[in-house]
Amino acid sequence: MKKKFLVLIMISMAGFTQAQDIGSIFTDRPSQTDAVALLPKNVFQIESGYFWSNDEVLGNATTSMNIPNLMLKYGLLPWLELRAGTALLYRKQENISILTTNTELGGIFIAPKLKILEPKGLIPRISATAYLTLPGTGTGFAKDNNGALNTRLLLENPLSDNLSLAYSIGTDSDFSGNTNGFYSIMLSASFGRLGAFTEFFSNVINGGPNAVGLDGGVGFTLTDNFTIDLAIGLGLNTYATDIFLNSGIGYRIH
C-alpha cells in the first residue's frame, strides 16, 4: 500500500514539473515577423500595446495610433495555436486647410497558427498562419465590409544558443481582387532576460512600387510569464510609412 502511495506521489510530482516547465514567455510582437514557435498546449496569453505612426505625402500628413491593440492566444494542441484580436484606432489627417480626426474600432481577426516542422541541422523551424479579418467588423473608416486574408509562412534558423534568424513570406488580400505580397527578415538575440532584434521588411505592391522598411527593438522579460517591449521603425523609401513606434506587454497564464 505504501509503495502504491509513493508511486502516485512521484507520478503527480513528475506531471506537475512537466506542466510548469514551459520556459519563458515569447510573443508575436513588436516585430513584423510573427514568432515561429507555438504556445504550449493549454497555455493562454494576452498581448497588447500602443502603436503610433506618421506619414507625409505631398504635404498631407497622417498620424495613426492603436490605443491599444489586443491579441488573445491559446495553445489548443501541440501543433495548433488559436489567436484572435482587434484594436482601437485613432487617425488624424492634416493638410494646409483641413484637419480631421477619427477614433474607431478596428476589424476583428482570427489567426490560427500551425506547426509544420521542428529545426534539424540546416532545416529551419517552420510554421504557418493566416489572419482572417471578419467581414463587416469594425466601425467608421476602420470597417471592413469585404474582410481580408493575410497569409504567412514563418521560418527560423537557430544560429547559436542566443542568436537566431527568422524570416517570413506571404500575401495580403482584401477579397475585392487586390492581392499584394509581403516578406521580412529578422535577426534576434537574447541576453538572459533581455532580448533585441533588427528587421528588414517589404510590402510587395501588385502593379506598383514596393514599400520597404527597417525596424528594431528590445524586450525585457520581467518574469517567466510577463514581458515588456519597445520598437521603432523607419520607411526606407517614399512608399513606406515614414516612422512608427510600437510598445506593449505580453502576459501568460498556465
What residue ranges belong to the model's regions?
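Transmembrane beta-barrel domains of Gram-negative outer membranes and organellar outer membranes
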Residues: 20-254
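Generic secondary-structure transition motif, activating predominantly at the C-termini of alpha-helices
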Residues: 13-14, 29
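Sec/Tat signal peptide C-region and signal peptidase I cleavage site
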Residues: 15-19
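Sec-dependent N-terminal signal peptides
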Residues: 4-13
